[in-house]
């Protein structure tokens, strides 16, 4: 098995994108949303690059992340993905990649309690 600490930021973000999206989709469905268009529209408030960049900025400002999580964020943010953001500038896109890397890292290290705590924190901030 590979050491998760050696996985590059883009791979962690790839994992984190799927994991965070799954938690958000579950949350929205459990709130009673069932129509695909409404689900997609609402999910965007949580999972878009702009939303994730805002959330990670708040996490850093409020010192929510551990030292290790900040390190993972920076690794994801600073990795050159060679892809272009669809609806965000480069800085926003990189910040959201860092956000997703943190989610991916927590999932890959099976730190689900911490992952779910951060997801809940994000939901509260978006719905606040």
Swiss-Prot record:
InterPro entries linked to this entry: Mini3_fam, RNase_III_dom, RNase_III_sf
Question: Which Pfam family is one of those matched by this entry?
Answer: Ribonuclease_3
Active site (catalytic residues):
17
- Tell whether rRNA processing is among the UniProt keywords: yes
Recorded GO molecular functions are: ribonuclease III activity; rRNA binding
Provenance organism: Streptococcus pneumoniae (strain ATCC BAA-255 / R6)
Q: Which PANTHER family match?
A: MINI-RIBONUCLEASE 3
> Where's it mainly located?
cytoplasm
Name of the protein: Mini-ribonuclease 3
Task: Give the GO terms filed under biological process for this record.
Answer: rRNA processing
The cellular location(s) given in this protein's UniProt record come to: Cytoplasm
